[in-house]
């Protein structure tokens, strides 16, 4: 995990009396690492490596799970976050239906980013079953290959982003379930200032994935015009990224406008 799903799984494991082992790339923020440790997770940090490398965090977690399964006589499971479509089904059975209830079915488009891929796939499936004309759009950070995959069926990565846990160099089993009409490639220079604006003007303390989602929703709104209902997901908090989001040196280096209060 890049952290957030691991945090959720650790809380569930604690409540169920299970031991949780969380594998994460060492490049993720200190805040997420500290939170996992404080909740009692057995945190294993590994160097960030491409998916094809056997040392990649997903591959390593599978190797580790196999060892635990053998050691415990089958009394362990590999959550397999990215390719376990329980994630997509969870959003299909809950989030998608909740959106339809709250909008009374009057929704023109849904847009969000993809990390595991379950949100866009599950919500999209529920919405398309209700009305096939509802547009499902991907908001993809720079440095991810999914934008080009939707546009041309080629996994090509361009640029970079300070966001974590969204974007991918591959098509996960969850993402493969998605029916996506279009995609936007979102620059940090458009997304991050929106996070600061929402803190100041709306009292919303949101994280980087939410910033990408909101920037995508605004772009979509400008494209399809007034009088439409667009839904996105505010899925993370700024607290988990403060060492990046509120790091003046990093923002300056990435040419992202620095909020006046920093």
Residue ranges and their predicted role:
Residues 5-66, 142, 146-154, 171-172, ...:
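Active-site-proximal loop->helix
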Residues 215-262:
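Phosphate-binding loop/pocket of nucleotide- and phosphate-handling active sites
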Residues 69-114, 123, 177, 181, ...:
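Active-site/ligand-binding-proximal alpha/beta "capping" segment
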Residues 82-86, 115-118, 140-145, 170, ...:
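Glycine-rich beta-alpha junction loops
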Residues 6-19, 37-39, 122-131, 215-225:
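Alpha-helix C-terminal capping segments
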Residues 3, 13, 36, 79, ...:
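Buried hydrophobic positions in well-ordered alpha/beta secondary-structure cores of metabolic enzymes
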Residues 58-69, 129-208, 245-262:
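Active-site/ligand-binding loops adjacent to catalytic centers
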Residues 23, 46, 81, 137-139, ...:
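Generic beta-sheet signal
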């Amino acid at each position: 995990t890049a952290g957030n799903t691991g945090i959720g799984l650790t809380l569930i494991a604690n409540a169920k009396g299970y031991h949780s082992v969380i594998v994460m790339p060492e490049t993720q923020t200190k805040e997420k690492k500290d939170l996992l440790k404080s909740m009692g997770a057995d945190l294993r940090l590994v160097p960030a490596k491409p998916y094809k490398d056997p040392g990649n965090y997903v591959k390593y977690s599978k190797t580790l799970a196999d060892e635990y399964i053998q050691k415990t006589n089958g009394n362990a499971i590999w959550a397999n976050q990215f390719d376990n479509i329980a994630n997509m089904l969870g959003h299909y059975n809950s989030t998608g239906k909740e959106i339809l209830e709250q909008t009374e079915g009057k929704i023109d488009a849904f847009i969000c980013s993809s990390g595991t891929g379950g949100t866009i796939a599950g919500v999209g499936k529920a919405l398309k079953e209700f009305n096939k004309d509802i547009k499902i759009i991907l908001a993809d950070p720079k440095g991810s290959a999914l934008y080009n995959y939707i546009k041309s069926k080629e996994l090509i990565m361009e640029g970079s982003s300070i966001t974590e846990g969204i974007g991918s160099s591959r098509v996960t089993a969850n993402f493969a379930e998605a029916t996506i009409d279009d995609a936007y490639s979102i620059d940090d220079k458009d997304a991050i200032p929106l996070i600061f604006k929402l803190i100041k003007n709306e009292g919303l303390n949101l994280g980087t994935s939410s910033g990408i989602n909101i920037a995508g929703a605004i772009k979509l709104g400008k494209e399809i015009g007034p009088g439409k209902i667009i839904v996105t997901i505010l899925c993370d908090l700024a607290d988990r990224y403060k060492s990046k989001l509120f790091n003046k040196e990093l923002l300056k280096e990435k040419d992202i406008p620095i909020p006046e209060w920093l």
